[in-house]
């Protein structure tokens, strides 16, 4: 059987905890979370910078006012 049962996952988790310890796993989790947060922040900043630099078109009718008299 190629699938993982719940017992495989439980045994794997116990082995990982025994090897690394809970404090080490917590630090690894913090580091991975910080890396993901920084990556999302940089992607968001690039998207905002790209949207500010992209050319924009304005769809509007030009209005002209004609004045025939000139005041001096």
Swiss-Prot record:
Major localisation: membrane
Cell location: Cell inner membrane
Keyword Chaperone recorded: no
GO annotation terms (biological process): protein transport by the Tat complex
Region ranges (Disordered): 47-72
UniProt-listed Gene3D superfamilies: 1.20.5.3310
Keyword annotations: Cell inner membrane, Cell membrane, Membrane, Protein transport, Translocation, Transmembrane, Transmembrane helix, Transport
GO CC, alphabetical: TAT protein transport complex
Membrane-spanning intervals of the chain: 1-21
Record-level Gene Ontology MF annotations: protein transmembrane transporter activity
Membrane topology designation: Single-pass membrane protein
Compositionally biased region (Polar residues): 51-72
Function: Part of the twin-arginine translocation (Tat) system that transports large folded proteins containing a characteristic twin-arginine motif in their signal peptide across membranes. TatA could form the protein-conducting channel of the Tat system.
Assembly and interaction partners: The Tat system comprises two distinct complexes: a TatABC complex, containing multiple copies of TatA, TatB and TatC subunits, and a separate TatA complex, containing only TatA subunits. Substrates initially bind to the TatABC complex, which probably triggers association of the separate TatA complex to form the active translocon.
Similarity comment: family membership: Belongs to the TatA/E family.
Protein name (record): Sec-independent protein translocase protein TatA
Species, as recorded: Acinetobacter baumannii (strain SDF)
